[in-house]
C-alpha cells in the first residue's frame, strides 16, 4: 500500500543527503560522458506542485531531467525495480514510487495526484514507454486525466541524445551528447481530454524538432540593477 505524501512529514522541496550525494555523482558523470546541457530550467516553479511532461528516450531520462533543477523531482518507476530492498530504498530516497505497467494502475494515478496536490514536482512521460526509434510516440490518455484532476502548472520538456546514448537495443549506455530544454508552462485550463492531448503532442514535437535543429532558447532576462 502506498502512503499518500500528505501523510509524510517531509519537506517537498528539501534535497535529502542521499539525493544531494547521488545528484553530484550523476552530474559529474553526465558532464563527462554525455556533455549534458540543460536550457530553460527557470520555467519550472521553485515551489508548489507542478508536473513536468517529457518525451521518453531511455532509462537515463528521469535522472537527466532532475540534474538541471534545484528541486527534487518525483517520478514513477516500474514495480519490478522495488523488489531488491537495497535498490528500493535508494530510489524511494530519490522520490520514486512504483507503478504496474500495462495494468491501468489506479493506485499510481492517485499517488501522482496526491503528490502534485501535496506540493511535489512530478515527472511523467505522456508517451507511456520508451521510443523504439528516437521519435516521439502518441500521447497516452491517462496524462490528460492526471492534468485535469491535479490542477497544477504543467511544464513541457524535451530530451535529445538520450536515445542514441542508450537505445532499447543496448544493454548499457554509451557516450553521446545529451540536451534538455524546459519550456513555458502550458495553459490547459478548461480543455477537454482530446484538446489537452493534442496540445501536449504539438508542443513536445515542436520543441523536439527545434532542439534537434540546434535552436536553443534564450537565457532568462537578468534582474534590473545587475
Q: Predicted regions: what is each one?
A:
Residues 24, 31-32, 39, 44-103, ...:
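Catalytic core of membrane glycerolipid acyltransferases/transacylases, capturing the structured
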Residues 37, 74, 179-181:
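Generic structural signal for residues positioned in beta-strands
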Residues 8-10, 14-17, 28-47, 221:
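N-terminal signal-anchor transmembrane helix
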Residues 2-17, 107-226:
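Non-catalytic C-terminal accessory region of glycerolipid acyltransferases
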Residues 36, 40, 76, 89, ...:
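Secondary-structure transition/capping residues
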Residues 1-8, 44, 66-67:
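A short, flexible N-terminal coil/short beta segment enriched in small residues
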Residues 34, 71, 176-178:
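Residue-level signal for beta-strand positions within conserved beta-sheet cores that form or flank
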